[in-house]
Amino acid sequence: MDNQKNLILAIVVSCVILFGFQYFLAPKSQAPEPPTQTSQQAGAPQAPGASAPSAPGAATPNASGGTTPATLIPTASRESVLAKTPRAQIETPRLRGSINLVGGRIDDLTLLDYREEPAPNSPQIVLLAPDGTAEPYFAEFGWVAGDPSVKVPGNDTVWTSSGGALTPEHPIDLTWDNGAGLRYTRHYAVDSEYMFTLTQSVTNTSGAKVTLYPYALTARKGEVPVSPTYLYKVGPIGVFDGKLDNYKYSDMKPNGPNFQSTGGWIGFTDKYWLTALIPDQKEKLSATFHHVMQGKTDVYQVDYRGDQQDIAPGATLTVNNRFFAGAKQLALLDHYDDALGIPYFDHAIDFGWLYFLAKPIFEVLDFFYAHIGNFGLSIMLLTVLIKLIFFPLANKSYRAMSKMRLLQPELAKLRERYGDDKVKLNQEMMALYKRVGANPMAGCLPIVIQIPVFYALYQVLYVTIEMRQAPFYGWIHDLSAPDPTSFVNLFGLLPFTPPEISLIHIGAWPIIMGITMFLQQKLNPQPPDPMQAKMFMALPFVFTYMLSQFSSGLVIYWAWNNLLSITQQWLIMRRAGVSRAKPPGGNKTPAKAAKT
């Protein structure tokens, strides 16, 4: 098999990969996705453990062991619901919200650094919302009593606050006395990012031992986010005994999985946002992913329950929990992993099966961004770095391709001599390659080595919050989204908006990429077979269309990579004294040359 056929095979395989990538993995066109806040007091099917009490929720265990849906509260505006109950305000550089003093839930959080759209006046992202709104989503902590006669704080408990807003410099305490010898205290603290620390304590002033089980839950109700692609998952997620488990919301129906673990964490993950309950990493716990129906409404809940805790008369029991609610910033998740010992916290970002490659690529991009302040330029610098890393390999490949160009006249003679004897032709061709030290597969290598990097970079562009709404220059305002321009209206020069049809919605950067691919082809020898030549001529158009639906940052990478490859290949050809090859027979077509 000669060099041209091998090269065509590599390109066809690449096209198949990219077409499959686009069909199965690339997202369908959709409006930007703000976090979907959901859940009333979420469903609490039987918590793990046959004899242990359940973590409470809106659907509470009934006498038969099933669940009884709570009364649904008609939805109201967020502002009116927040005004109905006393609240302790949350004020940090990244968050604004409040803790409901009736029940003690963290059910009101807005992310100050992120907006739904790139426009500066776009609404800020609302992550958590209280019960009674259209999309409730909240976190709850508490105790379950071993003896049903023991009064524990519930969803209607009115807590007394120590006063002031919860800030990184000012923790707050909530207290409640059950009137029967138990005093409950919740100490809330928050850092300057997205991590809450909740210390629960119970002081027993009664004359008898009390048995309690600590619990924590996160719940959401109604319509939940759905991933439009297989690139990432949204839904319940957790790490149990050092193993990551993540699921789709549909996996929780009718009954979600249960886990036994020491330490770990559990929560809900969206594309860019995460809520996570984090117990003491030495604590043994039972965790559950729940789903129940409240009328016609889906209710989703993740929770964990700690081991039995006995509190002697006069003793105080203390349990520590953490709650993360915010953006999935890789450096921040790594920091919490290192500083707090939260295992695999960075895996909340779904880098997929090329995690080992995608994470370093992002870290390099983030390093460049810290110095130049633009992720588009960072992608270009990353491309140069990748070129330098693969330079010895690519250099060897291009030199081998140059040798193949010099062999074109000899190969043409062999085809003319042994054209009817394919076995003999292949034997003579391989002998020729061996004699001159040429590699017929050399042309495949520059294309093949790009595929893993291409996929990993796409994953980085698509799932990292840092790339969300990251601008480049000119018309590119979001590197994670496709090029917004279209050749139909001359890239915005004509005063109308073309329809959002992928067949015609091809922007400027994909066309630039196609041009660079066409120029790169001109440095390669023209195939002797007219059909092969037509296939090569069609490839830039095929790739232009395919990549027009991909992230603009990825198209910029591909175009810039082509330009660097053209420069490198031209310099090597010049040093080797090889001109752009023509088909045997000079300017004649291969078919005519064969007749002369």
Protein language model annotation of sequence segments:
Residues 1-388, 496, 579-596:
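Membrane-protein biogenesis/insertion across secretory and organellar systems
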Residues 8-22, 454-457, 511-516, 541-542:
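Core hydrophobic alpha-helical membrane-spanning segments
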Residues 9-10, 553-560:
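Hydrophobic alpha-helical membrane segments of integral membrane proteins
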Residues 182, 200, 314, 389-454, ...:
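Membrane-interface amphipathic helices and adjacent TM-edge segments
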Residues 346-417, 424, 430-434, 470-474, ...:
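Transmembrane alpha-helical segments that form the functional core of multipass membrane systems
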Residues 372-375, 545-555:
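Transmembrane helix interruption/hinge and helix-loop junction motifs
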Residues 459-514:
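Conserved catalytic motifs of ABC-family nucleotide-binding domains
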Residues 503, 507, 511, 547-551, ...:
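Hydrophobic transmembrane alpha-helical segments of multi-pass transport and channel proteins
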